Amino acid sequence: MTQSGNFKFHTPIFRVNNRQENIDFYQNTLGFKLLTEENALAVFTDWTDRNSLFVIEESPAYRCRAVEGPKKINKVVIKVSDPLEIEYLLARDDHQAKAIFQGEKGYAFETISPENGLILMHAEDDLSTLKTVEYADVEEKEDFKGVSDFTVESLTLNVVDTAQAAFFYDNLFGEELPLSIHFEKAEGPDLQVSPDQTWDLEILEFKVAEDYDLVALHEKLEKEQFSSYLDTKESLLALTDMSNIEVPMTAPQDSRKRYFPERSVPEHTPLH
């Protein structure tokens, strides 16, 4: 998890078509460890139990469909601590790399998920050092299982209105947004569709500090015409961003499992 002040980024949740195909991809190509499968969910972590988290939810074609036009998710950037693990991933499954880069610490690569999502895997402190290379000179490590840790470092979202999209997250987190979110202006029929209809990014889940006042945040959002839901225990605040991506925020004392693929949350109410 990535933390900034009062907030931690817990996990993204992606709706997918074929769960097993995606499990194979995240395990073999990205080196994630499958932590558990529960109903339609598959939950991934790292191989040293450092609290890395990444979640997918299977939605079959009779309930969901492919995105028409650009997806809400443009790019996912994932950082690992050990540059050698990037080499081991490339040695194990290099045909999945659509582009290979060389940086100050080592290699990086871009790959495409089964749902046609662009993912960059790297171990750099400065992405500007990455230069495209034709191939990676790597050797396979026989006992390599997967990455020892990973962080969802940044997301790029395709949005209808970049100013409104940025305002939502600025208003919600201020300067404490615990990951980088970039916005690309795009046009398409599914950029604001309900998250249960397409195979796309569905949820961005956050945790708040133990002493953080979710009630005050809920009241602030309501005054600013953003509809949100606060549960009776005052430990879960749920709302959606301008792209209808669900953004649940939970307190640490709330011990219930915190994945919401089947629960409806209020849609955003744009400011006038």
Describe each PLM feature range.
Residues 24, 54, 66, 86-88, ...:
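Short acidic, gly/pro-rich beta-turn/loop elements at beta-sheet edges
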